[in-house]
Amino acid sequence: MSSVTLTTTTTTTSTPPKPTPKDEPQEQIYTPWRLFIYDIWVLGIVSTLAWGCRISTYLIPLFRSNVGKKHLDIGAGTGYYLNQARISSTTQLTIVDNETHALNVALARCKHPVTQTHGIVTDILQPSPFPETYLTNNDQKFDSVSMYYLLHCLPVPVASKCKIFTHLKKYMTEDGVVHGANVLGKGVRKDNWFARIIRRGCLNHGVFHNEEDNAYEFERALRENFWEVETWVVGSVFVFRAKRPILDA
């Protein structure tokens, strides 16, 4: 029998935070029908024609080859990558998002008769986004972490986005791997007409916050926190895989 649970966590209290006006746009963006459209429009048409990165060619193979026995997926979206990755029934899967609608959709999509699936509502930008037991209990640490098309949506400077890798490595095993992709806003090829329209719309509507996001700073942050780092720029997309976190003594 499958096990699907949902938890809310914060760094200061055990009760869920009250919604704020700032959270409300995300509630509107991640309604179920828009999440369905997301798969077709964003991951299919826009990623290929605007950003020059075909998901099925570049990102799904990377995802499939880097899922461990205890996997953490950050930024649930629609659960598309997890669904396409053909997660093993023996994998313990934890899905994280700061928005309940998206997380519930991903959890429902990834249900498996055997797989143990756990959902957490939390803010990944916080220094300690998970309960203390994830730090003290090695059995709860993750051997693989994924974050696809997440970083360009976070409304913080690129330096704050880079700190996520510092926070995450504390929750990973010694041989753990983190992998993902995000749309860059700086130091990439010139946008075609379609990309210009999409980028302008995403920025104006607060979907993208990536004007200063660049490959150099992301790669530097990865190399500061992991022993083995591989990065690629595919079209306007930064793709990465980093292994073996540099853990503090």
From Swiss-Prot:
Give the family, as the similarity comment puts it: Belongs to the methyltransferase superfamily.
Q: Where is the composition biased (Low complexity)?
A: 1-15
Name of the featured protein: O-methyltransferase adaD
Keyword terms, alphabetized? Methyltransferase, Transferase
- Top-rank taxon: Eukaryota
Which organism was this protein described from?
Aspergillus niger
Answer whether the UniProt record assigns the keyword RNA-binding to this protein: no
The metabolic or biological pathway listed in the UniProt record of this protein is:
Secondary metabolite biosynthesis
Q: Which Pfam families match?
A: Methyltransf_31
Recorded catalytic reaction(s): these are: 2-acetyl-3,4a,8,10,11,12a-hexahydroxy-1,4,4a,5,12,12a-hexahydrotetracene-1,12-dione + S-adenosyl-L-methionine = TAN-1612 + S-adenosyl-L-homocysteine + H(+)
Q: Which GO terms describe its biological process?
A: methylation
Q: Establish whether keyword Nucleotide-binding is in the entry.
A: no
- Name the gene behind this protein: adaD
Enzyme class label: transferase
Ranges for the region named Disordered are: 1-26
Coiled-coil features, chain-numbered ranges: none
